[in-house]
């Protein structure tokens, strides 16, 4: 019953017109009136922001804010893998032989997430990490490793919530939502960085031009809170011993090591 009611409410409100109206509003000067309340409600750390709160002219500018230089030091340990985002690690687990993962009791197919069995094949029996960005988080995405972009592609159109309720009751948002996948190679192995759009403000913007990425380099940003899924090949990563789910992480913090 709860699942049915949740999905009904989402379908009634989640359509292209409402998304366009919200996008127009958040980019308008009128939205600036909400900035002080937004910052207070979501307890945004203003000390870290590149600009003073009053200098953001729209909510959109605040959503995609940059941070002061040096605010997010990048772990430089050899072969370390860093968190690409400020987020909550919602889940960590093994990718099954049939390409399925289980997140919050719901089964997802990474073949569906990536768009094909061929794309998913290299990640079978590997590891997945789910990183959820709330509206309070810094929304820019950074490369978790140094490596070379092998492929980049987008899938899906519409997006549903990717918060805990969305993961529990939604229509497989991790594999159905609009998403942009960047596959990076390093040490002879691959990592898939799956950037998943959020309900209403369904936007992911790439900011890197080169196929060569440096660990910690900015690669994209979300226009609103969303989710990043990291997929690793079998035996390609050793998690840092302190990493568990759920827990908060920030850009640049070590989450593991490439083997």
Swiss-Prot record:
The record gives the membrane topology as: Peripheral membrane protein
Q: Which GO terms describe its biological process?
A: phosphatidylethanolamine biosynthetic process
Q: What is its EC number?
A: 4.1.1.65
Q: Which gene encodes it?
A: psd
Positions of post-translational Pyruvic acid (Ser) modification? 226
The compartments listed are: Cell membrane
**Subunit text:** Heterodimer of a large membrane-associated beta subunit and a small pyruvoyl-containing alpha subunit.
The lineage is: Bacteria, Bacillati, Bacillota, Bacilli, Bacillales
What protein is this chain from?
A: Phosphatidylserine decarboxylase proenzyme
A matching Pfam family: PS_Dcarbxylase
The cofactor remark states: Binds 1 pyruvoyl group covalently per subunit.
GO MF terms on file?
Answer: phosphatidylserine decarboxylase activity
Please give the chief subcellular localization of this protein: membrane
Cofactor needs? pyruvate
> Which keywords are on file for this protein?
Cell membrane, Decarboxylase, Lipid biosynthesis, Lipid metabolism, Lyase, Membrane, Phospholipid biosynthesis, Phospholipid metabolism, Pyruvate, Zymogen
Q: Which InterPro entries match?
A: PS_Dcarbxylase, PSD-B, PSD_type1_pro
Which residues bear the site annotation Cleavage (non-hydrolytic)?
225-226
Report the NCBIfam families cross-referenced here.
PRK03140.1 (NF002853), PS_decarb (TIGR00163)
Q: Which domain of life is it from?
A: Bacteria
Q: What does this protein do?
A: Catalyzes the formation of phosphatidylethanolamine (PtdEtn) from phosphatidylserine (PtdSer).
What general EC class does the enzyme of this chain belong to?
lyase
Its recorded reaction(s) are: a 1,2-diacyl-sn-glycero-3-phospho-L-serine + H(+) = a 1,2-diacyl-sn-glycero-3-phosphoethanolamine + CO2
Summarize the PTM comment: Is synthesized initially as an inactive proenzyme. Formation of the active enzyme involves a self-maturation process in which the active site pyruvoyl group is generated from an internal serine residue via an autocatalytic post-translational modification. Two non-identical subunits are generated from the proenzyme in this reaction, and the pyruvate is formed at the N-terminus of the alpha chain, which is derived from the carboxyl end of the proenzyme.
Instruction: Please provide, in alphabetical order, the Gene Ontology terms of the cellular component aspect for this entry.
Output: plasma membrane
* Pathway where it operates: Phospholipid metabolism; phosphatidylethanolamine biosynthesis; phosphatidylethanolamine from CDP-diacylglycerol: step 2/2
| Active site positions, chain numbering | 86 (charge relay system), 142 (charge relay system), 226 (charge relay system), 226 (schiff-base intermediate with substrate)
């Amino acid at each position: 019953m709860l699942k049915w009611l949740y999905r009904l409410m989402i379908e009634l409100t989640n359509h292209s017109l409402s998304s366009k109206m919200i996008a127009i509003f958040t980019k308008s000067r009128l939205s600036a009136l909400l900035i002080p309340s937004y910052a207070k409600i979501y307890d945004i750390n203003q000390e870290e922001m590149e600009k003073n709160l009053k200098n953001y002219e729209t909510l959109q500018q605040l959503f995609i804010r940059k941070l002061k230089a040096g605010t997010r030091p990048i772990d430089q340990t050899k072969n370390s893998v860093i968190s690409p985002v400020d987020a909550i690690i919602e889940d960590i687990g093994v990718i099954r032989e049939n390409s399925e993962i289980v997140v919050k009791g719901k089964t997802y197919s990474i073949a569906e997430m990536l768009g094909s069995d061929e794309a998913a094949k290299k990640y079978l029996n590997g590891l997945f990490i789910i990183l959820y960005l709330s509206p309070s988080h810094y929304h820019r995405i950074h490369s978790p490793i140094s490596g070379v972009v092998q492929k980049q592609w987008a899938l899906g159109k519409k997006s549903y919530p990717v918060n805990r309720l969305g993961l529990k009751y939604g229509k497989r948002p991790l594999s159905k939502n609009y998403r942009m996948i960047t596959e990076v190679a390093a040490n002879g192995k691959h990592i898939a960085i799956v950037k998943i759009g959020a309900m209403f403000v369904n936007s992911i913007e790439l900011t890197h031009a080169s196929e060569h990425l440096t660990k910690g380099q900015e690669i994209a940003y979300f226009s609103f809170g969303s989710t990043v899924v990291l997929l690793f090949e079998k035996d390609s990563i050793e998690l840092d011993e302190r990493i568990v789910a759920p827990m908060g992480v920030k850009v640049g913090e070590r989450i593991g090591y490439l083997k």
